[in-house]
Amino acid sequence: MKQLITITTILFTSLIFSLPSWSESEVDLVEIKLLNNLDDKRGFCIDIKGHKLRAKISRGIQAHTCYSYQGEIAVDQGLDANKLKEKKLFFPYFDVCAHPTSSKNPLNLNLKKCGSTEEFVFSEDNTIRLKNNTNLCLTVAEGNSRKGGGGSPLHLIRDLSMKTCNQQNSVYKTWGVRGFKKGKIFIKKISKLTSN
């Protein structure tokens, strides 16, 4: 009986330590952050609507206070860095990619299983554009942010959609990639992914 308890304890401990810690797993997680912090010093990141593990992929994406100030990248903001190099916005925890809702109305994005084609172009001006319509950029809503349901100070939320690219109001359209490397935070402009 004692051996059975010991074996069970070892197996349980092995299982616990083998579960993925999404910030430190074999998937290199990063967040995509608006380069301008706007009205939140923590910045705005692409985020699945809902709360972390309980995010609702059917509700789509938004711009939300970046969670990395808490010391790790949250699963509802964590994108696979290797898939970004393939021009895909892939959230590995939920196994979904961002896609235009349709070719007729590409202004909104939804989340679904990844396809084999690239959906986005990361431009030299640090914008994220649709591959099949490079006149449209991923854009954070202007105006005042809405208050979220958590955080201290409260997290802030803004709508996110594809809008016409232009230099006017570029602070709402320019993006960077941020993550952790050897325990230290790094950020680089989205245009740096074009060289890969």
Label each PLM-derived region with a short phrase:
Residues M1-T8:
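Bacterial N-terminal signal peptides that target proteins for export
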Residues S25-K41, I46-I48:
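An edge-strand/N-cap motif at the start of beta-rich repeat modules
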Residues K41-L53, Y93-K104, N133-S145:
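Extracellular/lumenal glycan-associated surfaces
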Residues W22-K33, K56-Y93, N108-A141, G148-N196:
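Exposed, tryptophan/tyrosine-rich binding patches on extracellular proteins
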Residues M1, L34-L38, M162:
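Detector for methionine-enriched segments
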